Amino acid sequence: MGCDDKCGCAVPCPGGKDCRCTSGSGGQREHTTCGCGEHCECSPCTCGRATMPSGRENRRANCSCGASCNCASCASA
């Protein structure tokens, strides 16, 4: 599976709470965390994630980060 450049989640998101990348040829998997320390799920971060678009869309996973989210991957230009 391909991974994005934010948190290592599979793209497209497979659903569920397991968003991992295969590392090496042995099939071992590496659990990835986000800049804010939250575990990686469908969104690069889950801290204050909004369900409706808030102007800070995470276009990689079709999720939106809430206004209180200060993760680098949720930064808006």
From Swiss-Prot:
Keyword Cytoplasm (UniProt): no
Pfam families: Metallothio_PEC (PF02068)
PANTHER family linked to this entry: EC PROTEIN HOMOLOG, METALLOTHIONEIN-LIKE PROTEIN 4A-RELATED
Cited InterPro entries: Metallthion_15
GO MF term list: zinc ion binding
Organism: Zea mays
Stated name of the protein: EC protein homolog
Functional note: Binds 5 molecules of zinc. May have a role in Zn(2+) homeostasis during embryogenesis.
Record's keyword terms, sorted: Metal-binding, Metal-thiolate cluster, Zinc
Upper taxonomic lineage: Eukaryota, Viridiplantae, Streptophyta, Embryophyta, Tracheophyta
